[in-house]
């Protein structure tokens, strides 16, 4: 098997193992990969892969600390349009809530603030991956929601 094909198989197996959310140590991941036929895998390589794919330790349903991949649709690249950073847009009677890729909320909020009151935006509050935005006078929350959907080419 070609080296790149073998590497792709390793990455696929690695991600599948992390999705199981049952491995609490790098050694356990090494052992599981070796059982699948990846004989040249070691703790150092697993550590680099965990870092490369942004794996984190979190509690699973059994309250055990395990490695898993973050719930992110994709890591943005330099050629990604900003709209790819917006994952979901919803609203209630008071605010429009925008969910973004981790770390992208402040960038998107800055863009919305720059559009300002002319587009119906009174202001925004951004965390790491969530934005609250409220409509300016003369605009309803639904108007603002629809304007933001259109801005990011989202479906109703």
From Swiss-Prot:
Protein name (database record): Arginine repressor
Q: Which InterPro entries match?
A: Arg_repress (IPR001669), Arg_repress_C (IPR020899), Arg_repress_C_sf (IPR036251), Arg_repress_DNA-bd (IPR020900), WH-like_DNA-bd_sf (IPR036388), WH_DNA-bd_sf (IPR036390)
Q: Which UniProt keywords apply?
A: Amino-acid biosynthesis, Arginine biosynthesis, Cytoplasm, DNA recombination, DNA-binding, Repressor, Transcription, Transcription regulation
Assembly and binders: Homohexamer.
An example molecular function term from Gene Ontology annotations: identical protein binding
Q: Which gene is annotated as encoding this protein in its UniProt record?
A: argR
Q: What the protein does?
A: Negatively controls the expression of the four operons of arginine biosynthesis in addition to the carAB operon. Predominantly interacts with A/T residues in ARG boxes. It also binds to a specific site in cer locus. Thus it is essential for cer-mediated site-specific recombination in ColE1. It is necessary for monomerization of the plasmid ColE1.
The principal localisation class reads cytoplasm
Does the record carry Zinc as a key word?
Answer: no
| Source organism of this protein record | Escherichia coli (strain K12)
Q: In which pathway does it act?
A: Amino-acid biosynthesis; L-arginine biosynthesis [regulation]
Output the Gene3D superfamilies linked to this UniProt entry: 3.30.1360.40, Winged helix-like DNA-binding domain superfamily/Winged helix DNA-binding domain
Could you mention a single GO BP entry for this protein? Answer: regulation of arginine biosynthetic process
Q: Where in the cell is it found?
A: Cytoplasm
């Amino acid at each position: 098997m070609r080296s790149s094909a073998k590497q792709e198989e390793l990455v696929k197996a690695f991600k599948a193992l992390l999705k199981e959310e049952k491995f609490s140590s790098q050694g356990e991941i090494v052992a599981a990969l070796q059982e699948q036929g990846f004989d040249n895998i070691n703790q150092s390589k697993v550590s680099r892969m965990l870092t490369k794919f942004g794996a984190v330790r979190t509690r699973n349903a059994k309250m055990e600390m395990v490695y898993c991949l973050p719930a992110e649709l994709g890591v943005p690249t330099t050629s990604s349009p900003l709209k790819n950073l917006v994952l979901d847009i919803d609203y209630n009677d008071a605010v429009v809530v925008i969910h973004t890729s981790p770390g992208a909320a402040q960038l998107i909020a800055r863009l919305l603030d720059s559009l300002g009151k002319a587009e119906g935006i009174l202001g925004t509050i951004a965390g790491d991956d969530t934005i609250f935005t409220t409509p300016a006078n003369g605009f309803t929350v639904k108007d603002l929601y629809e304007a933001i959907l259109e801005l990011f080419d989202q479906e109703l």
